[in-house]
Swiss-Prot record:
Free-text comment on the cofactor: Binds 1 [4Fe-4S] cluster. Binds 1 molybdenum-bis(molybdopterin guanine dinucleotide) (Mo-bis-MGD) cofactor per subunit.
Secretion signal span: 1-31
Subunit description: Component of the periplasmic nitrate reductase NapAB complex composed of NapA and NapB.
Protein name: Periplasmic nitrate reductase
Its EC number(s): 1.9.6.1
Organism lineage: Bacteria, Pseudomonadati, Pseudomonadota, Gammaproteobacteria, Enterobacterales
Gene that produces this protein: napA
NCBIfam families, per the entry: NAPA, PRK13532.1, TAT_signal_seq
Binding-site residues for [4Fe-4S] cluster, renumbered to this chain: 46, 49, 53, 81
Main subcellular localisation: periplasm
InterPro entries xref list: Asp_de-COase-like_dom_sf (IPR009010), CT_Nitrate-R-NapA-like (IPR041957), MoPterin_dinucl-bd_dom (IPR006657), Mopterin_OxRdtase (IPR006656), Mopterin_OxRdtase_4Fe-4S_dom (IPR006963), MopterinOxRdtase_cofactor_BS (IPR027467), Periplasm_NO3_reductase_lsu (IPR010051), Prok_molybdopt-oxidoreductase (IPR050123)
Family named by the database record: Belongs to the prokaryotic molybdopterin-containing oxidoreductase family. NasA/NapA/NarB subfamily.
Length: 828
């Protein structure tokens, strides 16, 4: 058979990805022509990271049997990474949960009982009793939910609506708190609106790429393949990679920079100083479109108020800032000289200058990419603000080929966690619970009494752990995440809180994860194409998919669980009399009636679904639930810069990037000719701010919450590897991926290993002030730490690396710093 050049390149890309992981390409990925007639194909976004690759899913006899990259998908253009090629296998692990499991002893629930199969009716009976008891005895603040950037858009919307409007509790937060919260607050502080202004099309037009704490080669491999193609096709294109250790992205780097942990703040201020000292400020852009402010400092570390670091902080948690002049800002960054920066960071001067020159050169279009290195940082918001400073000083923003771009790690951290408003402080379309006008907009649109939504910010992820341990949060529903393994400092707060007899923990999951096995009730959940869904990726692209198969056994989607559970509560049981008096017609109605079976949500009939189209939730309820929820939600953003297209448009497209106005998506926000919200003659308008100007912040270096000392003498950084995604609850059930990287290891510099009498392959005990794990020494391989630092991935349930990590957070975003704590090693 003769191959076209395109087919040849695709086939080789697949083989290369597989070879890099030590794998053979699975038969299901080959989509053999002879089988295609027997296989039904439909589109879906990939289940894994926030890149948002499009895939074609092949189903046969009620199972997903094949998967291939969608050649019509603009994100990945027919390619998949190695995880994407094994998507069919994530749903068929041998230990897939198919019925609810409750801890029982002598025929009834018991905290120390054995997991026993029960019906959904029995499961909801116990949940109902626990919710109602806590609501009656302690009120809405005694219940909470921990959700996900892997929820579909309507699942997140339904969860936020149920908790914030139904139960009147803002104690709902997504696991995106652990990965994207600093990016959110950074965007809001600088631009007044969340999410990137650019898109992936920038890659083919950029002259330079700077990676700040992002190993795109392994974590966003499809985007990295596009960057690689751009770099190798033009010798003038440059790539700079900054990290606290060397990794696979360094292989392409023209300037690979390893810096001392936390000192990225110093480098960012040095570059701003370099730009000013070399007269590289875009004065016209700066004068018209930028304000300057000096931020509060010494803001603490998000630890408990009794912690010595919090007591010592002068301005704990302060988001305050004050105006400053350009001369004052110039003097502020002038302290970050080349000599000082080289000394504080450990980076050679010539490398620092080369990096600064990329930003300062007016003829270089620069994209800054970052992921967890910036965000999982006790000054993550500051790091985000400081990188925006570089683009605002030079005017390299909101135009093709240049701009700051925060990459997401989950498939709908943007579309669900951020845009829908599932954070404990947010409402849809960048609105917040503390703003009375925003609450009023939601209450009127949802047709619920004024004052229903609480004005108090709910508990964020780490605060939920602490409240569980303290007995203040007593009923906790965890959906679509594995936070017992993924969250920080397992031993001190989370595990004690989950196993406290005062508390009842529900986990909805397809598999018996560490979280599920630590709970009191496990609810079996439908996965991916076992339900109709929608995700929003890192470039503001909203993508839909249809239900293509049924879930096994009694497994139900998160949406089904939320909506059906809402039937258990009447308004009189959850709302005070003062609210009911405003709308007496709501008396006697259930939360299902008030929130999900309203005229606005239920107006789309089943006739809009094709006769043979699967949609378990809608067919059970008698109306097109997903469409009703989406259209109700989309109303919030239309006309306000968050415009989403009509529901049906997404099923006919490979995703659309908002704002979508008059059927046209937006590639670059805030610039004239690209963004429909920027009028002719305005040039640029950062319309999230009242005056249309973005903000440059003066923010200093401040040290990490914990650093190595004589006893705990090494930095620990945690993260991921190519073959596994997050806690491995899906990828470790794919035999090929598990074989490729079967267990976590400790990546360590050979000299550090030698000094501790350790050799490659030795068992080693890694200890911090909070706990310990036993791992395996690795002195070679893809990750090459400098002396003084070790790196461990967190996918391995047998090596709970978060026994070691500290629950210090960015005080502004409440996002955990998983990249910096102090450990010691001992040979086992």
């Amino acid at each position: 058979m003769k191959l076209s050049r395109r087919s040849f390149m695709k086939a080789n890309a697949v083989a290369a990805a597989a070879a890099a992981a030590g794998l053979s390409v699975p038969g299901v990925a080959r989509a053999v022509v002879g089988q295609q007639e027997a296989i039904k194909w439909d589109k879906a976004p990939c289940r894994f990271c926030g890149t948002g690759c499009g895939v074609l899913v092949g189903t046969q006899q009620g199972r997903v049997v094949a998967c291939q990259g969608d050649p019509d998908a603009p994100v990945n253009r027919g390619l998949n990474c190695i995880k994407g090629y094994f998507l069919p296998k994530i749903m068929y692990g041998k230990d897939r949960l198919t019925q609810p499991m409750l801890r029982m002893k002598d025929g009834s629930y018991h905290k120390d009982g054995e997991f026993t199969p029960v019906s959904w009716e029995q499961a909801f009976d116990v949940m109902e009793e626990k919710f109602k008891t806590s609501l009656k005895e302690k009120g809405p603040e005694a219940i909470g939910m921990f959700g996900s950037g892997q929820w579909t858009i309507w699942e997140g919307y339904a969860a936020a609506k149920l908790f914030k409007a139904g139960f009147r509790s803002n104690n709902i937060d997504p696991n995106a708190r652990h990965c994207m919260a600093s990016a959110v607050v950074g965007f809001m502080r600088t631009f007044g609106m969340d999410e990137p202004m650019g898109c992936y099309d920038d890659i083919e037009q950029a002259d330079a790429f700077v990676l700040w704490g992002s190993n795109m080669a392994e974590m966003h491999p499809i985007l990295w393949s596009r960057i690689t193609n751009r770099r190798l096709s033009d010798p003038n294109v440059k790539v700079a990679v900054l990290s606290t250790f060397q990794h696979r992205s360094f292989e392409l780097a023209d300037n690979g920079i390893v810096f001392t942990p936390q000192s990225d703040l110093v480098i960012l201020n040095y570059i701003a100083n370099y730009i000013i000292q070399n007269n590289a400020v875009n004065q016209d852009f700066f004068t018209k479109h930028v304000n300057l402010r000096k931020g509060a400092t010494d803001i603490g570390y998000g630890l408990r108020p009794t912690h010595p670091l919090e007591k010592a902080a002068k301005n704990p948690g302060s988001d305050a800032s004050e105006p400053m002049s350009f001369d004052e800002y110039k003097a502020f960054v002038a302290e970050y000289t080349l000599d000082k920066t080289a000394e504080m960071t450990g980076v050679p001067k010539d490398q620092l200058e080369q990096l600064a020159q990329l930003y300062a050169d007016p003829n270089k279009r620069v994209i800054s990419y970052w992921t967890m290195g910036f965000n999982q940082h006790t000054r993550g918001v500051w790091a985000n603000n400081l990188v925006y400073n570089l683009h605002l000083l030079t005017g390299k923003i909101s135009q093709p080929g240049c701009g700051p771009f925060s990459l997401t790690g989950q498939p709908s951290a943007c579309g669900t966690a951020r845009e829908v408003g599932t954070f404990s402080h947010r409402l849809p379309a960048d609105m917040v619970v503390t703003n009375e006008k925003h609450r009023d907009i939601c209450e009127k649109h949802w047709q619920i009494p004024a004052g229903t939504i609480p004005a108090k910010v709910g508990l964020h992820a780490v605060a939920q752990d602490r409240a569980l341990k303290d007995g203040k949060l007593n009923v906790y529903w965890v959906m679509c995440n594995n936070n017992m393994q993924a969250g920080p400092n397992i031993n001190e707060d989370r595990m004690p809180g989950w196993r406290d007899p005062r508390n009842f923990i529900i986990v909805s999951d397809p598999y018996p994860t560490v979280s599920a096995l630590s709970a009191d009730l496990i609810l079996p959940t439908a996965m991916w194409v076992e339900k109709e869904g929608a995700y929003g990726n890192a470039e503001r692209r909203t993508q839909f998919w249809r239900q293509q198969i049924k879930a096994p056994g009694e497994a139900k989607s998160d949406l089904w669980q939320l909506v059906q559970f809402s039937r258990r509560f009447k308004t009189e049981e959850v709302w005070p009399e003062a609210l009911l008096a405003q709308k007496p017609e709501l008396r006697g109605k259930t939360l299902y009636d008030v929130l999900f079976a309203t005229p606005a949500v239920s107006k789309f009939p089943l006739s809009e679904l094709k006769e043979d189209q699967l949609n378990d939730e809608s067919r059970e309820l008698g109306f097109y639930l997903q469409k009703g929820l989406f259209e109700e939600y989309a109303w919030f953003g239309r006309g306000h810069g968050h415009d989403l297209a009509p529901f049906d448009d997404y099923h006919n497209a490979r995703g659309l990037r908002w704002p979508v106005v008059e059927g046209k998506e937006t590639q670059w926000r805030y610039s004239e000719g690209n963004d429909p919200y920027v009028k002719a003659g305005e040039g640029y308008k950062f319309y999230g701010k009242p005056d249309g100007k973005a903000v440059i912040f003066a923010l200093p270096f401040e040290p990490a919450a914990e650093s190595p000392d004589n006893e705990y003498d090494l930095w620990l950084s945690t993260g991921r590897v190519l073959e596994h995604w997050h806690t491995g609850s899906m990828t470790r059930r794919v035999p090929e991926l598990h074989r490729a990287f079967p267990e976590a290891v400790v990546f360590i510099h050979p000299l550090d290993a030698k000094a501790r009498d350790l050799r490659r392959g030795d068992k080693v005990k890694v200890s911090s002030r909070r706990g310990e794990v036993i791992s395996i020494v690795e002195t070679r391989g893809r990750n090459r730490p400098p002396q003084g630092l070790v790196y461990m991935p967190f996918f391995d349930a047998a090596q709970l690396v978060n026994n070691l990590t500290l629950d210090a957070t960015d005080p502004l975003s409440k996002e955990t710093d998983f990249k910096k704590c102090a450990v010691k090693l001992a040979k086992v």
